[in-house]
Design a protein with these regions (language model features):
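N-terminal accessory beta-strand-rich subdomains and adjacent acidic, glycine-rich linkers
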Residues: 1-158
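Conserved catalytic cores of very large enzyme subunits
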Residues: 162
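Phosphate/adenylate-binding glycine loop and adjacent helical scaffold
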Residues: 167
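Aromatic-lined carbohydrate-binding/catalytic grooves of carbohydrate-active enzymes
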Residues: 172-220
Length: 220
């Protein structure tokens, strides 16, 4: 926690994991900072991370074995701050933390805004704030990790006063059908007519939700 007041610039965080190259890890490996977090978790070794192509890293949770124990590195209560990643630079002796720098200039690429220039720091934030939790969950086998609620317990309380109206249910999903349909009198695509059509379709078929996927903020 920081109580300095005003605005604060965080240059970097340091975290070095005490792993040997032969230690087993389970990692969600992605290529670069920008990712949709949809990769398959990979069973490899700490040394295997060193052989990945430049820019590759692992997002949380990062799981490794040490002295017969299963250990999951996780984070919680993460707001206005870059998420923790793990990478293994070729000139390093063990895996360590990696954080996305703050974008300095953004450019439009397709339906995304991507940084073309970055700052030399990872966060510009309030000087009075709590920082994200970094935690190690230790277990004797994998199923204990799956049943652990450390991330939930470390998180801030819900900002929603009454969440009883939030319930699971089916949804019409525009991206899954590639913004497409048949028998309509307008051009299919990510446009207002298509969104209205999906809303009407959901209502007519008692589907409680509609999902507006990637590109909604700038158009497809």
């Amino acid at each position: 926690m920081s109580k300095n007041g005003g605005e604060m610039i965080v240059k970097q965080e340091t975290l070095k994991l005490p792993l040997k190259d032969a230690d087993k890890v389970i990692a969600h490996i992605v290529n670069g900072i920008r990712t949709s977090f949809e990769s398959i978790f990979t069973r490899t070794t700490a040394g295997g991370l060193k052989g990945l192509k430049k820019g590759a890293n692992a997002s949380m949770p990062f799981i490794f074995e040490k002295e017969g124990m299963k250990i999951a590195l996780v984070e919680s209560d993460w707001t206005e701050y870059p998420g923790l990643r793990i990478h293994y630079p070729k000139d390093a002796d063990s895996p360590r933390a990696l954080f996305a720098p703050v974008p300095k200039k953004l450019v439009q690429k397709g339906n995304q805004l991507q940084p073309s220039e970055v700052e030399d720091y990872i966060a510009k934030t309030s000087g009075t704030r709590e920082f994200p939790w970094r935690a190690f969950i230790v277990a004797r086998d994998d199923k204990v990790l799956a049943d652990n609620d450390t991330v939930y317990k470390l998180a801030s309380e819900s900002k929603i006063g009454d969440a009883s109206w939030i319930t699971p249910g089916s949804s019409v999903w525009d991206w899954w059908v590639n913004w497409n349909t048949k028998g309509v009198d307008f051009k299919c695509g990510f446009n207002e007519q298509m969104c209205k059509y999906y809303v009407d379709f959901a209502a007519d078929n008692d589907i409680p939700y509609i999902t507006l996927d990637a590109g909604w903020h700038v158009g497809r």
